[in-house]
């Protein structure tokens, strides 16, 4: 910056223009440097706040059916879990089911989705959001190109149920937004029956997660 100020002063002398005293060159250079830094510097971007996934209630007059699956390798079984809640976050029904172990985790997830949807249909709900944390399963439900998948026939079953509902939406969430269904699936093998259901209540093992999701959804 000092060199540029001297160069500018020399040019002005050649042109016969008024120039600043040589003693001021250093301070003028410092001022120019500060001005340049202010013009070219960008304010640091504030750190982006990461949104923590959480369960959210469905629109008014809808229900949300969350599903999940779990693997019990030691028993060669799998657990299915589902919970249906209204637009206030209150439980309408929940279920667990233990089934023979399928050949893949994805099939377990799709079976859980199908069971949750059948459960909603059995209870007479006609505006349903079917939500789970398996991105593969939800993507297949929202696609027309699914028959090549190992679980394509199960997706076909789910799509065949769609006309029985006035409105049906397939939605993906993260595990943190699917805690109760996940807990139900994990605990399925701990109940006395291979199939259990609850109406307007949840089993004790899920109560902490269920209560937390109600509080966090408001």
Predicted regions located by residue number:
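Primary recognition of RNase H-like, Mg2+-dependent phosphodiesterase/nuclease domains
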Residues: 1-218
